[in-house]
């Protein structure tokens, strides 16, 4: 999923803009390219704007219209897909062959694909004189919008007052943060492992073998997005003949090759540009980080921005910003394309557990061009007329997938009636889509709340503002949404980290929907966490531990601390503060400023990949199972120990009550006899009779028996 971008100037606006300063609601200050941003209590941010942020970047050479409009550097945390082995289903490792070239595709080049689809929109504005006039008009409109925002109330003041308030109120370190963590039980971990396995399969749906799915997990494969798309295309256009289809595919391959040749930026060069941009911005804003993730941030190297690749980086930056700041008719065209029932922005598949009558809907993350368009159209709109605010691009994509899946939902209810259950899950963008689809089925009356099992997401961005309030309004508990987040995954932090004040003002300037966005105005974030937040920490050999979490791997539920609340509702406030601190530690800018974060072997890929989630959950289960086995072994030894003590006492001439011995023997046999009988039956069945003596009798008991025999002789 998703991207974080910073651009270097306002698209279509002269470098000086009028914005509300920190001196009060009525104050107006002028921000210029040579002036630093007003000092506010805020965190750093990397995100995408069509109108770049001029004060952050200096630019040498050429200052024409084109250079003013396409300046900026893009910071993106896309799902960097690795080669074959990283996404192989565990049960089918030897059978699945991944498409290496597709899986290693650069997220920057994927963004360039998005840019190419929007290029024709800019060709209409080639005349420089008309552009200059339009820029001046737009400047007046934006300035008026910023100034007039204070007429209805002091939203800016509330941003400044509320920003970081809860986090500062509750000082959280590792010790205090650990008190808010509860280890997930073994049955819950096994459920999460099963769903993470299905989420991993979603990236290779064409390779799924229904027989293996049934063998390992007892699930029956039902259908997939590929089958739905094929059926829709046949119904609309008719089936393509066998002779024509290869010709069409060949033409498409030629067009794709030409498109690739037209690109003037390589993945390695793009990573260098992005890392330089993030590092430079990190050095400029390091002193205003509200949640400093580590001491390394204070001692990080300050890299100079290399603007020799400005032409290439501007293509990337512009493609990221072109969607959210485009005209409404253009954005509506993208929305219509996203909710098309013919194609799906993310692949998905459905499988059934016939014993529990549960239908699993599994959705993959960002892979296609359509999914990237959904990511980039991040402006807020209302969700289903219920007052909650939602990410527009993902909401529009969910509408199209809703129409595709609805027949399968109705068919399952028709077959099983009130006993029908639905479990939605997904990774990255797929997790956000799973949540919206689940809620849409309930709101639209297609599925009762009793049939909807909790939604479980992996590394998914939060896409709702007022989500917890919406759950309460629908009569659902917070546990209905369970968001599993890798300890250093950048994607869940993308929309929920703290945004600087001036970035919030720029968002309001380029898109009117942000001006009344409550999360941005009062919490300095785009979309707030909702439901339950579960934190997954893998082994330290795989990824360094998190500074707020206990050492070692584990899966924790972040919950309220109910010990002696200081004030009313302090538990809920403490929980929100803990979520805020965690989602800003490390801050996305800290992650992006590290050059080792990029590429198929970078930390972004490592901490966000679905296969990493699967491996981490399974390692937690192994650790828990080993602890349980160790505890049972110690328990059995404690039950047999009195027998050994009694025999030793008898052999040394010490009198011991027979009733005491018999009672201890009887208690031990009652608690361990069944296990011993099971072991004995397995040994008999395997014809390993010589091992019975070794297995049934402890070593000490054998030595004592032998000693007694020799002593009598």
From Swiss-Prot:
Segments for region (Disordered): 118-140, 232-261
Places the protein is found: Plastid, Chloroplast membrane; Plastid, Chloroplast stroma
UniProt name for this protein: Phospholipase A1 PLIP2, chloroplastic
GO cellular component entries: chloroplast; chloroplast membrane; chloroplast stroma
Induction context: Induced by abscisic acid (ABA) and cold stress.
Species whose genome carries this gene: Arabidopsis thaliana
Keywords: Chloroplast, Hydrolase, Lipid degradation, Lipid metabolism, Membrane, Plastid, Transit peptide
Residue ranges with Acidic residues bias: 122-140
